[in-house]
Amino acid sequence: MLIPRLDEVRRALTAFHFFNTLLALAFPVIRSTSLCDYVFAVEGNEQCEIDSREREILMFLLIILAWKGRKATNWMHYVNNIFLFSKIAGMFLFIRADILPGIIYILACLIVTVLFPEPVYNGPEQVTYFQGEQLFEELTRNRNTIWVIQFFTTWSPECRHTSPVFAELSQKFTLPNMKFGKLDIGRWAKEGERFRVNAHPMSRQLPTICVFKDAKEIARRPLVNDSRRAVPFVFSEENCVLAFDLLNLYNEQKEKKGAKAKKED
């Protein structure tokens, strides 16, 4: 699993992360401490603690989280997966132990979701946001510039989790003749069709990142197989650099820029 960077740790210092951490830890903490006797109804001399079935469920949760960690784009994405699956497991475990605490826990999850939504990435980036046919017109007009384009929708969690990665790439690889851009195909569905990106949730094509050179697409992730299903791709920074050959493209465009400057001199 990726080690969190300092900027990611700072981004986690929000009410969203604080309250979701409490919800994620609520059941194992309450069930394994003296709070258990106050929260759950205990019959007779029965000891209030985590039983064998609950322990199995928690172990299964850890296995799922470890598996999800391999598919996370970055540390923040992984943390959100921890919150999601821990709360789902918590709902089941609370209701299984006692219906009243279970209902209260579900209501608490709903309240936190409404009052403290997941923060949107607002860090530094060098990204051009296109509307309508602007992207197609720019590709046609300026063939000397390589464009790395992310097709996204505002409602897709995967698109939100990819935003920090795309922003970081734009900071590292932007040149006057190599640029990064975004197009919301949720708003501009016809442009999604033009660039062969299916915005339907079941297509699993969101987000899609394409590289355009001389107005032609030279790379795309995720790839789409013969049955029109997207081949899963983890949009980590390292995977994107390798899949789109960004280092070589960057050096190539940098050399062209330098040669053009010398020629003009």
Swiss-Prot record:
UniProt comment concerning the protein's domains: The thioredoxin domain lacks the 2 redox-active cysteines, suggesting that it lacks thioredoxin activity. The di-lysine motif confers endoplasmic reticulum localization for type I membrane proteins.
Subcellular location: Membrane
Membrane disposition: Single-pass type I membrane protein
Keywords tagged on the record: Membrane, Signal, Transmembrane, Transmembrane helix
Signal peptide: 1-32
Molecular functions (GO terms): disulfide oxidoreductase activity
Name of the protein in question: Thioredoxin-related transmembrane protein 2 homolog
Motif stretch (Di-lysine motif): 262-265
Pfam families: Thioredoxin (PF00085)
Extracellular face residues: 33-96
Claim: Nucleotide-binding is one of the keywords in the record: no
A GO cellular component entry from the record: endoplasmic reticulum membrane
Keyword Membrane tagged: yes
Natural source organism: Caenorhabditis elegans
Cytoplasmic face of the membrane: 118-265
